[in-house]
From Swiss-Prot:
Organism of derivation: Chromohalobacter salexigens (strain ATCC BAA-138 / DSM 3043 / CIP 106854 / NCIMB 13768 / 1H11)
Alphabetic keyword roster: Cytoplasm, Ribosome biogenesis
Family under the similarity heading: Belongs to the RbfA family.
Claim: Cytoplasm is one of the keywords in the record: yes
GO terms for biological process, alphabetical: maturation of SSU-rRNA
Protein name, as recorded: Ribosome-binding factor A
Example of a GO MF term: ribosomal small subunit binding
Length: 131
């Protein structure tokens, strides 16, 4: 069995190309600092789900606005990809907001809170034993 599947290689290549294209070629002022966090390509290479994050922005309205800009530019992006990557058929691009980063930050803050609470309890217990 092969080490890497073709869909994985295509997804990696799409991620690299889209990251460059979004930053350099889309001139829409509504577009924020978009990062392509991952790309998943269907087995038949018919479509690609592109997951993005926005640097420093978690507002739902801004996220929707950025997704709207990217969805509007998907034809342009697809044609640019066709010029850069040798594929018989360039997958249809479907953009999604990647909530895993936000969830990860939330989990991290919950862990930090739990550790701080535990330390406070430990300090309170130590003070009670001293008395």
């Amino acid at each position: 069995m092969r080490e890497f599947k073709r869909t994985d290689r295509v997804a990696d290549q799409l991620q690299q190309e889209l990251a460059v294209l979004i930053q350099r070629e889309i001139k829409d002022p509504r577009l924020g600092m978009v990062t392509v966090s991952s790309v998943k390509v269907s087995r038949d290479l018919g479509y690609a789900d592109i997951y993005i994050t926005l640097l420093g922005e978690n507002d739902a309205a801004r996220i929707d606005e950025n997704l709207k800009v990217l969805r509007h530019a998907r034809g342009f992006l697809r044609s640019q990809i066709a010029n850069r990557i040798k594929l018989r058929h360039v997958p249809e691009l479907r953009f999604h907001y990647d909530e895993s980063v936000v969830r990860g930050q939330r989990l991290s803050s919950l862990i930090d809170e739990a550790v701080a609470d535990d330390r406070r309890r430990h300090e309170d217990d130590d003070e009670d034993e001293v008395r």
